[in-house]
Amino acid sequence: LLMSLHWLDAVEHIVVRTFEHAQKYDVRVTFAEARSRRAAHALARLPGVQAVEPYRATPVRYRFGRRERREVLVGAVAEPRLDVVLDAHDTPVALAENGLTMSTKLAELLGAKLGDVVTIEVLEGRRPVLRAPITSMFETYLGTPSYMRLSTLNGLMREGPRISGAYILADSAYFDPLNRALKNTPMVAGAAFRSAIINSFRETLADTINFMVGFYILFAGTLAFGVTYNSARISLSERGRELASLRVLGFSTLEIS
């Protein structure tokens, strides 16, 4: 029962670490296609926007030895503030100028370690094949993310300063007009508000956690009943043997009772 209730604390820890300590933006905007940095300046002029941080999400296939993984490589600014990469101690991880910052889980799946050079097959645009060392690693509870400096990624792809979206920090009083403005912006393919993501995350796990808690409560109740019943049967059996022994010794039923 205590183990089942521990899941609630674990989920809350994931929510706080992921959606408060690491992801500090209010809206994640995705463009219909990669655009120039001017698109970020256009977002900064929308209602209630306080800060804009561009990123580039590129589909890639990682290869290391005989292993490969299809993932998304995120190009981030040199010192991200709205979507921060954290280590196990919640300390921001610096993105090296020339190299990959990879989750430990992804590195494990590839069989790679810190300092290994990984082949990166880009699956969009000119589809270049790149090679980059793993310069830093970090722990994460969700997914198998990987990062590279935005300027480095754009340089390797030889496409100039391009971005595929942006993180927005906004005044909560302007969320509704901001949402309407984003829906009316042709270059925007989607806008995900962090509050909606958190609610969806909680709702997705709620049914599973409630089922697990209910199962463990039922299991604990059944186990407690079984232990109590078994103890009562043993006690009754021992009492019966004691009474039988007294009868053998010559005591009458009245004397035993």
Regions found by a protein language model. Give the residues of each.
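Alpha-helical transmembrane segments of bacterial inner-membrane membrane proteins
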Residues: 1-257
